[in-house]
């Protein structure tokens, strides 16, 4: 292709049915940045191993050598995966970036499986190899407390209860729901997950003390302010991404420095954009898929709190932050693969690799919680809360039966009855036409007979 010639992307050359995808124009530039560099990575890896083998003296510290050997094994696996793993649906800022997080997902799942197969004591004490400060019970903290918005008992600062809630978790909630909105790309699903999680906190506050919050902290601070504002900003960003022109040109083909800087900045934006149209009420398959997505989202959210509790990790520990960063990077790819698999199963015949491993991670985390502290999760839920959940599940089942079975059967019956009526009316019309002709012929014969 000639230099500077624009072409449409392959995704637009073969549009998938029912897809809402923006048009992409690319000049086809394939620079050193985009190549796989498999030989280069293999050469660097070999040089590092040769250096460790021949030039570096191995220390006589069993614990240190064990840790270093495990880290080296993980790094070799990451090098292999980054260069050889299959590409996912995302290509920006670079396909290798998303291959890296796919391999990190595999490593994390293997780590969870290892923890799952340990005893409760050994699993908690194993965390000391990662951080010597871990492996000790968490101190008890007080939650809930005074829930007055305006406290007349503190005349100097009557709104102290509100200011006490203004900590680092407020921007974390906002940023988290902003990113979740970019993953899900649907306002209704985001709001349902946000409200449902608050109901879960209400229902499980007898198991985890940090779920015990004031009513205004649940519904005003969380749902309306933090989550709601994050969802609103996320939807505005989605609107901009859906309207943004996707025209890509090689960096060295851009004449001005301003254009080059702008091109570098846009490297961290999507290559193309697909608007998610979940349409859960369109058929039973999509309805069950959306319910499954909401369930897995809520389970992953609960795992965040329960894992900290059963593994004795304080909320401010860096491993908790690393887990959140991990899900931020793998969640978007997993949601895109789930949507592709659900929206066009004929083209995407199997669930994507990132979605598969994320689902396995979520289930494994929950199994660790079940094994390490079954007494906590088996604490009986209050009866009135159980009644509310039974009522909600019953309403979902009734609506599902009505929408996808009773309603469809009724519509099919009405359509069949209408067609039968049309067929019978056509038959009556066709039978009445010959009888009319015979009467007319009979009257003409009688007239001729009289004339004769």
From Swiss-Prot:
InterPro entries: PSS. Pathway: Phospholipid metabolism; phosphatidylserine biosynthesis. Its EC number is 2.7.8.29. Residues 419-452 are annotated as: Disordered. Keywords: Endoplasmic reticulum, Lipid biosynthesis, Lipid metabolism, Membrane, Phospholipid biosynthesis, Phospholipid metabolism, Transferase, Transmembrane, Transmembrane helix. The chain crosses the membrane at residues 36-56, 70-90, 100-120, 287-307, 309-329, 350-370, 377-397. Residues 57-69, 121-286, 330-349, 398-452 are lumenal. One of its GO terms (cellular component) is endoplasmic reticulum membrane. Pfam families: PSS (PF03034). It is a multi-pass membrane protein. It comes from the Eukaryota. It is found in: Endoplasmic reticulum membrane. Residues 1-35, 91-99, 308, 371-376 are cytoplasmic. It is an enzyme of class 2 (transferase). GO terms for biological process: phosphatidylserine biosynthetic process. Residues 430-444 have a biased composition (Polar residues). It catalyses: a 1,2-diacyl-sn-glycero-3-phosphoethanolamine + L-serine = a 1,2-diacyl-sn-glycero-3-phospho-L-serine + ethanolamine; 1-hexadecanoyl-2-(9Z-octadecenoyl)-sn-glycero-3-phosphoethanolamine + L-serine = 1-hexadecanoyl-2-(9Z-octadecenoyl)-sn-glycero-3-phospho-L-serine + ethanolamine; 1-hexadecanoyl-2-(4Z,7Z,10Z,13Z,16Z,19Z-docosahexaenoyl)-sn-glycero-3-phosphoethanolamine + L-serine = 1-hexadecanoyl-2-(4Z,7Z,10Z,13Z,16Z,19Z-docosahexaenoyl)-sn-glycero-3-phosphoserine + ethanolamine; 1-octadecanoyl-2-(5Z,8Z,11Z,14Z)-eicosatetraenoyl-sn-glycero-3-phosphoethanolamine + L-serine = 1-octadecanoyl-2-(5Z,8Z,11Z,14Z)-eicosatetraenoyl-sn-glycero-3-phosphoserine + ethanolamine. GO terms for molecular function: L-serine-phosphatidylethanolamine phosphatidyltransferase activity. Catalyzes a base-exchange reaction in which the polar head group of phosphatidylethanolamine (PE) or phosphatidylcholine (PC) is replaced by L-serine. Catalyzes the conversion of phosphatatidylethanolamine and does not act on phosphatidylcholine. Can utilize both phosphatidylethanolamine (PE) plasmalogen and diacyl PE as substrate and the latter is six times better utilized, indicating the importance of an ester linkage at the sn-1 position. Belongs to the phosphatidyl serine synthase family. This is Phosphatidylserine synthase 2.
């Amino acid at each position: 292709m000639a230099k500077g010639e624009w072409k449409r992307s392959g995704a637009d050359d073969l549009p998938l049915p029912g897809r809402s995808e923006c048009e992409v124009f690319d000049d086809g530039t394939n620079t050193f940045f985009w190549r796989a560099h498999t030989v280069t990575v293999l050469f660097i890896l070999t040089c590092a191993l040769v250096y460790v083998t021949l030039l570096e003296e191995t220390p006589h510290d069993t614990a240190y050598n064990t840790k270093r050997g495990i880290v080296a094994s993980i790094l070799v696996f990451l090098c292999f995966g980054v260069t050889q793993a299959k590409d996912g649906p995302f290509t920006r800022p670079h396909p290798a970036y998303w291959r890296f997080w796919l391999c990190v997902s595999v490593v994390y799942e293997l780590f969870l499986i290892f923890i799952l197969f340990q005893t409760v004591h050994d699993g908690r004490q194993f965390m000391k190899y990662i951080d010597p400060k871990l492996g000790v019970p968490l101190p008890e903290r007080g939650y809930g407390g005074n829930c007055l918005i305006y406290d007349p008992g503190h005349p100097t600062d009557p709104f102290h209860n509100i200011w006490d809630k203004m900590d680092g978790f407020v921007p974390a909630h906002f940023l988290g729901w902003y990113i979740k909105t970019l993953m899900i790309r649907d306002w209704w699903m985001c709001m349902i997950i946000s409200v449902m999680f608050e109901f879960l906190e209400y229902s499980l506050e007898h198991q985890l003390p940090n779920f015990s919050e004031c009513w205004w902290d649940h519904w005003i601070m969380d749902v309306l302010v933090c989550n709601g504002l994050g969802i609103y900003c996320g939807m505005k960003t989605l609107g901009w991404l859906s309207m943004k022109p996707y025209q890509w040109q090689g960096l060295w083909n851009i004449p001005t420095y301003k254009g080059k800087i702008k091109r570098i900045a846009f490297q961290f934006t999507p290559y193309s954009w697909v608007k998610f149209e979940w349409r859960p009420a369109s058929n039973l398959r999509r309805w069950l898929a959306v319910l499954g997505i909401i369930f897995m989202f809520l389970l992953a959210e609960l795992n965040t709190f329960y894992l900290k509790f059963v593994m004795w990790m304080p909320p401010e520990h860096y491993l908790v932050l690393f887990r959140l960063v991990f899900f931020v990077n793998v969640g978007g790819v997993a949601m895109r693969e789930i949507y592709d698999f659900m929206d066009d199963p004929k083209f995407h015949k199997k669930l994507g690799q990132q979605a598969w491993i994320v689902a396995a991670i979520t289930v494994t985390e929950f199994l660790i919680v079940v094994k390490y502290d079954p007494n906590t999760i088996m604490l009986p839920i209050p009866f009135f809360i159980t009644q509310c959940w039974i009522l909600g599940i019953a309403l979902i089942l009734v609506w599902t039966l009505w929408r996808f079975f009773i309603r469809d059967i009724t519509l099919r019956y009405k359509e069949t009855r209408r067609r039968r009526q049309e067929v019978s009316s056509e038959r009556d019309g066709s039978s009445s036409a010959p009888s009319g002709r015979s009467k007319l012929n009979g009257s003409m014969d009688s007239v001729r007979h009289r004339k004769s």
